[in-house]
Amino acid sequence: MRHQLRIPLLSKPADQRKALLRGLTTQLIREGRVTTTKARAKALRNEAERMISLAKDGSLASRRRAIGYIYDKKLVHSLFEKAQERYGDRKGGYTRIVRTVSRKGDNAQMAIIELV
C-alpha cells in the first residue's frame, strides 16, 4: 500500500530514481537552473534544499554527506563556500519552480527549477 509516501515514485525503480535525482541535483547546483518535468522538479526541490541546508551547516559531517550524494567533489566545495553568504538569512525556500509550455512529443507538463 502507498500510505504516506514522502517522495514521488516517478515511475522508476528505487535505484534509478535515486540516480536520476542525484544527477538532477548535481546539474541544478552546477548550472543554477534545470528544465525538466513538473513531477521531477517537485521531487528535485526536496533534494536540492536538503543539500543547501547541509552546505549552510558547514560541518565536516555534512560536507561528507554532500560528497556522498553529489557526483562532483569540486562542486561540493564551491557549494559549501558560497551557501553561507548566499543563503545565510534564509530558513528555506532556496529553489523556485516555474511552469513552462508542455513538451511537444508527449504533452508532459514541463517546469524550470532554479536556485533563488
Curated annotation (Swiss-Prot):
Which is one GO molecular function term here?
A: structural constituent of ribosome
Question: So what family is this one in?
Answer: Belongs to the bacterial ribosomal protein bL17 family.
Listed GO biological process terms = translation
Instruction: Check the record and name the Pfam families matching this protein.
Output: Ribosomal_L17
Name the record gives this protein: Large ribosomal subunit protein bL17
Among SUPFAM superfamilies, the record links this protein to: Prokaryotic ribosomal protein L17
Give the organism's phylogenetic lineage.
Bacteria, Bacillati, Cyanobacteriota, Cyanophyceae, Synechococcales
Name the domain of life: Bacteria
Q: Cellular component per GO?
A: cytosolic large ribosomal subunit
Q: Which UniProt keywords apply?
A: Ribonucleoprotein, Ribosomal protein
